[in-house]
Design a protein with these regions (language model features):
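Surface-exposed peri-terminal alpha-helical interaction modules
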Residues: 2-90
């Protein structure tokens, strides 16, 4: 079986990707209209958008690496109750 063409991939997945992109745009609009201090999760999303716009291959790996904790030593005590999806010191 051969790999699908770009047109075939677009035919299958474009509308889903379009909806997700519009969802993200609406989310960022809401964040930008909101009061309060900066949030590491929003910084992480904005960094990911830069990765997407650069057009390099392996975008998923690059974004996940950006969002990951680069330290090698475990913390004595966590400063959050749960994972947030983006390293807080990003």
């Amino acid at each position: 079986m051969s790999s699908p063409t770009r047109k075939e991939v677009a035919d299958l997945h474009f509308m889903d990707a379009r909806a997700k992109l519009l969802d993200l745009a609406a989310f960022l609009d809401r964040v930008d209209r909101s009061a309060g201090s900066d949030d590491h999760r929003i910084r992480g999303l904005r960094l990911a958008l830069k990765v997407l716009s650069e057009g390099n291959k392996n975008r998923v790996a690059e974004i996940l690496n950006q969002w990951s904790d680069p330290t090698t030593q475990p913390l004595e005590k966590s400063d959050t109750k749960a994972a947030t999806g983006v390293w807080p010191q990003i």
